Amino acid sequence: MNNRKPLQLSLLVASLAVAFTASATNADAHPPLAPLPPVPVPKDNPQSAEKIALGKQLFWDYRLSGDGSMPCVSCHLPALGWGDGGQISRGYPGTKHWRNSQTILNSAYYNKLFWEGSVNSLEEQAPSAAEGAVAGNGDPSVMEMRLRFVPEYVDAFKNVFGSQWPRMNDAYRAIASYQRTVVSDASKVPFDRYANGDKNALDTSQKRGMALFNGKAGCVQCHNGPLASDQKYYDLGLPDFAGFVDDPLYQVTHRWEHYQKGVSEPRYRAANMDYGLYYVTKNPKDVGKFRTPSLREAKYTAPYMHNGVFTSLQEVVDFYDRGGGSGTSKSELLKPLKLAAQEKQDLIAFIEALSMSEPLLHDDPTLPGEYQPLPAPIK
């Protein structure tokens, strides 16, 4: 029996862990970077080809929004890294959003969704987006009725879920199933190929960048494990988004978010910052903290950070090299790195090696036809 390849992989994982441990500023161990495991699937929403196909149609279907203009794909376009390419996500007509549209690439691996971790699963994420006032703004009863007047959907829901009529809870389950297919292909990710034994998958610059990532730059302190995210929350002291001050519609959205998330009266009146994790915990120590985003597919998912303040990986690396931003609650992990220009380029080269060599694209599905009168009263 040939045990050479497992031994090589074990040595690689060990070397990544040692590289960080030797240079870390604390004694905590961090999971090394590694290829993604199989996509986790909840027992109450198993995958099937038919459910995935239905979910893809629903992800693209304009009928799942208030005025029929904001399907899921409008903010998560495959050609734009499964985001929308803007600093701040486009809002529902008549509104403006207040955060960067996160990519849904590899979102199946997160234990919580949204920048402040406000929901626990893709099944919960879908309605939050489709029904959110500044996102899809769809009324679930109206969207459900629309689906019931489309014969193709009636048949598809009956086939997949065994229900007489389409139901929105099932629609969200189908969308979640589809999103679990929007994941990196390890055979096209240079780092994954390297980790799986192809020592030529990374070039010299990328290998130097990997050493920096796990060592001097300390990226692995937060961007670790297969997802390249510890899924924890930090205040980086990021620059503010000027629109919150300059644009009345952003102020409307910001104050509404404060109100519906239940912040204190003084914080509501100020409306001068995005409080992040605080909205979930109401712990003052969590003000300004946001979840560590995955670095997988970062090559294609600019702009970066919860407010889209950085347009390139160069800007991101420069920010961390300075020790992050300012603020009394800024993470103590952030310290000036004093990276040389070549080190920055090597680090960026390695971060890009966590992305596929070409972007993940899905063709638009064929959507069911127009509404048709029902042959019998709905029961």
Swiss-Prot record:
Binds 2 heme c groups. It is found in: Periplasm. Keywords: Heme, Iron, Metal-binding, Oxidoreductase, Periplasm, Repeat, Signal. InterPro entries: Cyt_c-like_dom, Cyt_c-like_dom_sf, Cytochrome_c_Peroxidase/MauG, Di-haem_cyt_c_peroxidsae, MauG/Cytc_peroxidase. Its cofactor is heme c. Induction: Abundantly expressed under iodate-respiring conditions. Heme c 1 binds at residues 72, 75-76. GO terms for cellular component: periplasmic space. Its EC number is 1.11.1.5. Residues 1-24 form the signal peptide. It is an enzyme of class 1 (oxidoreductase). It comes from the Bacteria. One of its GO terms (molecular function) is cytochrome-c peroxidase activity. The keyword Repeat applies. The keyword Methyltransferase does not apply. The iodate reductase (Idr) complex is composed of a molybdopterin-dependent iodate reductase (IdrA and IdrB subunits) and two associated peroxidases (IdrP1 and IdrP2). This is Cytochrome-c peroxidase IdrP1. It comes from Pseudomonas sp. (strain SCT).
